[in-house]
Regions:
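Alpha-helical transmembrane segments and their immediate juxtamembrane cytosolic regions
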Residues: 1-337
């Protein structure tokens, strides 16, 4: 008799991934360098690729148009950019920049890396998804060849310590101008394309058979790659080649486990994960500035305040719904008199 596999709603994994995003922003996580690298550069760094894959997957499954999707993403991005604008202004002021240069810096940041460190995600998603759509005429084979080539170029950031000669000069010149290769062109494009492809072909054997073995092999290869990077670390560790198959096969496995109907709890977890991702720096920065917290103390502090914020927001939403409903009922009663 076959044992029934437990179902793991994607919303719960989104929630866990959002906590990993908080953790990656908390500074040093362990005194032991190897453990710190394992937690921050391998485990936590899988969260954003997972979110990008999900975005590509849900976009392919969505019935809304490209314009509607863009409008929704831009509204969300603009709203939270306004929230973080004072922090971005203050940070640039600490760099002793004149007000005019701060304005230019924030305007440039809005279109490239965001006005605060986590908001780079929106320009990357928007531009990456635009690339996915604009290169559809190539077919998947050539699309993936292009996306993988760009991702490998992006990996120069991680493997910069291994570079020399003209390649090193090229990378340094690029970094001087654009700061990072973690953007929609070199980073987001491939993960979004993988998610889009998974959404279109999720029933194919490649995405349904032997997923446990594929995931295990990917994790082993990621461990080997992580060891190579750890021994000779580059400017940053945002890119690793085996982030791609690891997150892709993990999401394919998750999709197989989904219950027939999305539960209320899973929806709430997914919504909470989005708000945690967007709001957590507001609370994290207070812990760093006012209490000099770092590592896991800062992580738990941020979770506590972010959780309180989510709770208050939920209460406010309920009260607002009750007030609107009560007002409508009162008006209807007066009309009927």
């Amino acid at each position: 008799m076959k044992t029934k596999q437990p179902m793991v709603p994607i919303g719960y994994i989104q929630f866990i991934a959002s906590l990993l995003v908080i953790l990656v922003h908390c500074g040093r996580l362990a005194e032991n360098s190897g453990l710190h690298f394992l937690l921050k550069s391998l485990l936590c760094s899988l969260a954003v690729p997972f979110f990008l894959l999900l975005n590509g997957y849900f976009f392919q499954k969505s019935t809304c148009s490209w314009q509607q999707w863009c409008k929704r993403q831009l509204k969300l991005y603009l709203r939270w950019s306004i929230v973080y604008l004072p922090l971005g202004w203050f940070y640039l002021g600490q760099q002793n920049l004149a007000d005019s240069l701060r304005v230019i810096g924030l305007a440039t940041g809005f279109f490239t890396v965001g006005v605060w460190y986590h908001l780079w995600y929106f320009p990357a998603v928007l531009f990456g998804m635009w690339l996915v759509r604009k290169t559809r005429f190539l077919g998947y084979r050539r699309q993936f060849l292009l996306a993988i080539s760009l991702y490998v170029i992006g990996c120069l950031e991680t493997y910069s310590s291994y570079l020399s000669g003209p390649l090193l000069v090229f990378y340094q010149n690029y970094r001087t101008l654009f700061f990072t290769t973690r953007n929609g062109l070199f980073y987001g494009f491939l993960f979004l394309l993988c998610g889009f492809c998974l959404g279109e072909h999720q029933k194919r054997p490649f995405f349904t058979k032997h997923l446990g073995r594929k995931l295990a092999v990917s994790l082993c290869l990621l461990g080997i790659e992580g060891r190579l990077v750890y021994l000779n670390q580059g400017d940053d560790k945002n890119f690793m080649l085996f982030f791609v198959p690891t997150t892709l096969f993990f999401l394919a496995w998750l999709i197989k486990q989904q219950p027939p109907k999305r539960t209320w709890q899973a929806k709430q977890a997914a919504e909470a994960s989005r708000l945690i991702f967007l709001s957590h720096p507001l609370f994290l920065e207070t812990g760093k500035v006012f209490f000099s917290l770092a590592g896991f103390p800062l992580f738990f502090y941020t979770i506590a305040l972010t959780g309180a914020f989510l709770g208050l927001r939920k209460v406010g939403s309920r009260l607002n719904s009750y007030t609107v409903g009560f007002a409508k009922k009162t008006v209807d009663e007066k009309k009927s008199v």
